Amino acid sequence: MRPLTPRQAEILELIKRNIADTGMPPTRAEIAKRLGFKSANAAEEHLKALAKKGCIEIIPGTSRGIRLTQANESEEELGLPLIGQVAAGEPILAQEHVEQHYQIDPAMFRPSADFLLRVRGDSMKNIGILEGDLLAVHKAEQARNGQVVVARVEDDVTVKRFEKKGSIVYLHAENEDYSPIVVDLTSESLSIEGLAVGVIRNGDWQ
């Protein structure tokens, strides 16, 4: 299946959720309303693109004439998971942390992405990681100095630039308004959850 644009992935996820919640696909008007399109025609164009990519079948003559293809009926085909709030002490990729999936080709990123994390705050704005963006993350447990990491400090998950000197780790913000987070590994807990490998801009999902 060809990779989807962010908007196409969002519409496909909406269709799947609607079917799961109500037992039927949404109408074009419902898609337009929920995603802020000016008209149902805009939704129709996206549906046609999804059909061309083999994600759905369009059934003529009915307002709810949308059918998922077999490849999209399986949860495993949903694509990259978007991670929401992470509970204390639990793996970041635990199923209960997954808000939804986006059909984005992991190979778009180098190294390939394993999950997406929604950016909160502006501590990394100077390198273009902005509030509301989706950060593509490659799962990793080790990092080199200078890499941008997703780190868990005690029970808080944060995105920062990694620097280690002996037993001290500095997690640097890319915003002069924020001081580094300093972690003494002899007395505090820190784990690397992954490496930032790309950003999907917030506006692409609106």
UniProtKB/Swiss-Prot annotation:
CDD domains: S24_LexA-like. It catalyses: Hydrolysis of Ala-|-Gly bond in repressor LexA. One of its GO terms (molecular function) is DNA binding. It is an enzyme of class 3 (hydrolase). Keywords: Autocatalytic cleavage, DNA damage, DNA repair, DNA replication, DNA-binding, Hydrolase, Repressor, SOS response, Transcription, Transcription regulation. The active site is at S123, K160. The record marks A88, G89 as: Cleavage. Residues 28-48 bind DNA. The keyword DNA repair applies. InterPro entries: LexA, LexA-like, LexA/Signal_pep-like_sf, LexA_DNA-bd_dom, LexA_repressor, Peptidase_S24_LexA, Peptidase_S24_S26A/B/C, WH-like_DNA-bd_sf. Transmembrane segments: none annotated. NCBIfam families: lexA (TIGR00498). Belongs to the peptidase S24 family. Homodimer. PANTHER family: LEXA REPRESSOR (PTHR33516), LEXA REPRESSOR-RELATED (PTHR33516:SF2). This is LexA repressor. It comes from Shewanella sediminis (strain HAW-EB3).
